[in-house]
Amino acid sequence: MTENKCPVTGKMGKATAGSGTTNKDWWPNQLNLNILHQNSQLSNPMSKDFNYAEEFKKLDFQALKVDLYMLMTDSQIWWPADYGNYGPLFIRMAWHSAGTYRVGDGRGGGSLGLQRFAPLNSWPDNINLDKARRLLWPIKKKYGNKISWADLLILTGNCALESMGLKTLGFGGGRVDVWEPQEDIYWGSEKEWLGDEREKGDKELENPLAAVQMGLIYVNPEGPNGNPDPLGSAHDVRETFARMAMNDEETVALIAGGHTFGKCHGAASPSYVGPAPEAAPIEEQGLGWKNTYGSGNGDDTIGSGLEGAWKANPTKWTMGYLKTLFKYDWELVKSPAGAYQWLAKNVDEEDMVIDAEDSTKKHRPMMTTADLGLRYDPIYEPIARNYLKNPEKFAHDFASAWFKLTHRDMGPISRYLGPEVPKESFIWQDPIPLVKHKLITKKDITHIKKKILDSGLSISDLVATAWASASTFRGSDKRGGANGGRIRLEPQKNWEVNEPKKLNNVLNTLKQIKENFNSSHSKDKKVSLADIIILGGCVGIEQAAKRAGYNINVPFIPGRTDAIQEQTDVKSFAVLEPKEDGFRNYLKTKYVVKPEDMLIDRAQLLTLTAPEMTVLIGGMRVLNCNYNKSKDGVFTNRPECLTNDFFVNLLDMNTVWKPKSEDKDRFEGFDRETGELKWTATRVDLIFGSNSQLRAIAEVYACDDNKEKFIQDFIFAWNKIMNADRFEIK
C-alpha cells in the first residue's frame, strides 16, 4: 500500500477520521440531535448486563471508609497535603462535583461523575482537583466496579468531614458513571474562561445558569467581576445558591461550614501555571496546571490566586470561621498572585494560622469578598450570628445542607443505596408514600378500564391528562413524573399548560372511579388516582388504535401512590412547569430560543431518542392532544384515531407551506393545485419535514408498510414516559 502523499508536494495529508470542517461549522444553528443519543453502549466499557446497584451491594462499605480515612493523612511526595491532611482538598472536590447542579433544568451535579471530563475537569474553579482524583485512584482501583467514581467523589467528601470532627447526616450511593462529556448541559455562551456575558438588567442571571462567570462553580471569590464589593458579592451568592435550590440559611451554613476547613492557594503569579488537563502535554497523563514556581506544590501552590486560611486549626471542625469573621476588622490586600482578599487586623495569637507546611510560621486569617458578604449583608448577617451563638444548630444545619448539596440530583430516596441512607426523608426529595396495600390484579384492571371507558371522557382528555401527569419527569435530577399523582395538587393543577378547568373535570371523574373501586373492596386492596390517571391514558390509546383497525394492549404496571400537599414544596415544584411542551404544541410566550430547539431540550430531559420523540409527536397530534385543542399539526381528518396520518400528510408534496406571521412561528399549508387551505402548523410540526435527520425518521413512519410499526413504536415510547419515574420496576 502506498502512503497517502500529495502528488505535487510529496507531503503526507493531515486528515484523519472525524477531522475536517463539520456540519456544525457550516451551519452553526443546525438542530442538535446528538444530545438525544448520548451515553450509548458503544462508549461504555461495561457489559450490557452490568448492574451497578447489584455491584454496590457487594461493596465492603466500612472497609472502604477505613481506607478513605487513612488516605486523609497519607501525604504523597508528588502532591503534599496541606497541614498533613487531604481532607479540605477532598471536601472541595466533592463540593465542586455536586455544586454544578442547577434547579432550573436539573442538569449538572455529581450523579454522573462528570468532574472527570471536559469541560469540568479543566474549569478554572477546579484547578488542582485533578490531583485530588489522582490521589483517589489507588482506592478506586482496589474496589473497582463496586464503587463508581461519582459515588466515590461524594463519599470521600463525607469521610473528610467525619475525619475532621463533623457528624454527617449519612450517605446514599447509586450514582452511575457515564463515560463521555455530556453535550446537553448548557454552561454558557462565553468563549473565554471567566467570561460574564450571562447577566442582563439588574444583574439578572441567564437561565438556567447558576454561576456568574464561565468556569466558576458559583461566584468570583474576589467579588463581582473581581471587584471587592462584599454586598455585591452577597447578591451574587444569593442568586447562585438559590439556583442550586438553597435558601439563605442553607447558603450561610454551607459557606461557613465549608470554609471551616483548608486554605486557598496563591503563592505567586498565575503566569507560572501551565495549561489545564484538557490542553496539557500528553506526557502529563491527564494532569494539568503544572506549576513551575518553586517546588510547584506545598507552600508554592498556585490555585485560585487567593492565599491563606480562614481560621486557626484548618483541619478541625470548630466555630473558628464565624468567630474570626465577626471578631476582627478586615483590610483589603492583594495576594502574592495579585488577587483581592481581606486580612484580619490586630490578630490575637490564638487566632493566628500555622503555616500549611512549616509549623514555625504563622499567618493572619484571610477572608474572600464573598465571605465578608455573610457579615455585611442584612439577611445573611443575623443568620451567621445566630449560628455563632448556637454551635449545635450550626453543625446540624451544615450537615443537612451538605447532604442536600450532595444528593439533590439523585431523585427519590428509593434510589439511594448503602447502609448510611438516613431513615428520615426530606421535602426536597419529593417524598412519595410507600405502597402499604395490595395492588390491583389483571381482573381489577379490566374492571377499572371499563369504568373509564364508560365515563364519558374523550380519548384526547384521557391521553392528554396522562401525558400531563407523567411528562414532568426530568432524567437530569430524576424529579417529576406520574408517581405521587401531584397533577391534582398545587402548583401543577393550576399550570396553564394543563388547562386547569378541563383538568379538574377529568380528575373529578377519575377520582370518583377510584373511590368507587376502593370502597367496594377490602381495605388491604386499593388503587391510587396516580395509577388511574395512567390507566386512563392506556384506555384512550387502545381505543384510538381500535378505531384505526388494531386491537392492542397498552402495558400497565400498578404501584403508584398519591402524595399529599404537605409532601409537596410548591416553590420547588414550580421549576418543573413547562414553559413549552412541543408534544402538546404549547408555548407559554415567545422566547429567544426557537421552539424546535426547546423541543429537543425537553425530549432530552425526558430521556427520549430522536425516533421516540418523533413517533410521540406524530401520535399526540392525531390523538388531538394539543393545548387548548389547537388544530396546529393535527394533520388528519380522523382525529382520536391512532394512525400515521401526521407523517403522511406532512410529507405530502401536494401541500405548500407559507408563514402565517412575520416571525415565522406559525404556518399554513395550502393545496398546491387549488390553493385551498388544508392545515395549520407550528415550527415544532414542520421541523419533522425540514430537518434532514428528522425527515428521514418521519419517512419511516409514513411508509404504507409501517402503519402497525408506528402504533407499536408509539406505545413503546409512551410506556417509557409513563414509567420514567418508576425506579422500583427498572
Curated annotation (Swiss-Prot):
Covalent cross-link Tryptophyl-tyrosyl-methioninium (Trp-Tyr) (with M-244) as placed by the record, residue numbers: W95-Y218
Crosslinked residue numbers (Tryptophyl-tyrosyl-methioninium (Tyr-Met) (with W-95)): Y218-M244
Protein name in UniProt: Catalase-peroxidase
EC number: 1.11.1.21
InterPro entries linked to this entry: Catalase_peroxidase, Haem_peroxidase, Haem_peroxidase_sf, Peroxidases_AS, Peroxidases_heam-ligand_BS
Entry's Gene Ontology BP terms: cellular response to hydrogen peroxide; hydrogen peroxide catabolic process
UniProt keyword terms in alphabetical order: Heme, Hydrogen peroxide, Iron, Metal-binding, Oxidoreductase, Peroxidase
GO molecular function: catalase activity; heme binding; metal ion binding
Catalyzed reaction equations: H2O2 + AH2 = A + 2 H2O; 2 H2O2 = O2 + 2 H2O
Species assigned in the record: Clostridium botulinum (strain Eklund 17B / Type B)
Post-translational modification: Formation of the three residue Trp-Tyr-Met cross-link is important for the catalase, but not the peroxidase activity of the enzyme.
